Amino acid sequence: FKANLVTPSEKNTMRAYAEQMAIPMLSNQITNKNNSYFGAFKDNVRLCSLGTIMEGMASIYFCTDSEDLKKILFKSMSIGNYFLSKTQVKTGIFAGGLPNSANWVKPGVTPNASVIRIDNVQHVASGWLKFQKILDITGLY
């Protein structure tokens, strides 16, 4: 919005749409700290999907004027990052990698659950970088 590439009316329309999109995302996040998927989203423990959601929430954060929504998005991204950090590969040559599924370490999962793909890494890294920018702006980094 800072580049003024759209009219004020178009900005308002885009802002309203972005804020509207946040509601279904936020309402599906697992916020129970006792749940092993705390920070993920209901029915979806695919890390690429969570990374994409994180990218979207960060983008909404930057375009909304609502301080209340910014606080909610910040909390959501914080626990989303917590979940993602738990699911990263911790050791070996793939340390730091992000597999297809958060269930990659559980017995009996499909063989492709542990596959590390570039889109998993790209979406999560992009979401993390945007969140780092928010932490920097808010002085919480």
Where do the PLM segments sit?
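Glycan-recognition and catalytic cores of secretory/periplasmic carbohydrate-active enzymes
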Residues: 1-141
